[in-house]
């Protein structure tokens, strides 16, 4: 990898969600909420960060988790362990072969009943969807894009490509909104999918969210066509499901730069970046910013999530 590349790190323990949560929990405090609800997989980085931030803000975290990989009761690991240490109220739901989003949609009646019960007891709940991908949350990444371009300018770097992982879509939507605010059409945004999505609707939903960010921010700009490229070919077997090629690039980055990525998000995104470079889809000599979204806690999760990364090599 060309050493002239740039890496924007958003911490290797926590993920990019802290950008969203800065805005979301400010909104929760403004509304006088004392409880935060959110949702995700059992090893969700978003859930762990939300629980952490809620505690920092004096609010009680309540989470519903879809068990894509079933945790062992006597061997709680990684993000789920941190959720437990934080004293989070945890409800684990069987996934039954469904995606996390599908699991949550099927159980929405449970969440609404729980929220209503707490309201009857005098509590006020702030409800954050999967990934924190709302117009308020995604605004954190509009700010991120503006900051990143300012840093590139101060470094004398014209950014040709900005590459990041994309799951619930809030990160990419925020980046697109930030690019629109700057009238920046010289930087190609690339999202590397980490879970299987409907290609016919996924990109358009991100555009709609980006426009909602712009509207919420009071900006005049709007996006009328896809301002990014999304690659779905690096998902592998699915969300939270590792594969050899991605794990090989996780090792490569760790062994050449001492930088850790995870097998769920940033590792698949980095593998996608490397493959785009190797195949010439990102031309030699390009200036590339890789937005490292953290999440290294996944390296300590269940074997089904990390794959062959735990094999000791001579």
Where are the predicted features?
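PLP-dependent amino-acid enzyme catalytic core
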Residues: 1-314
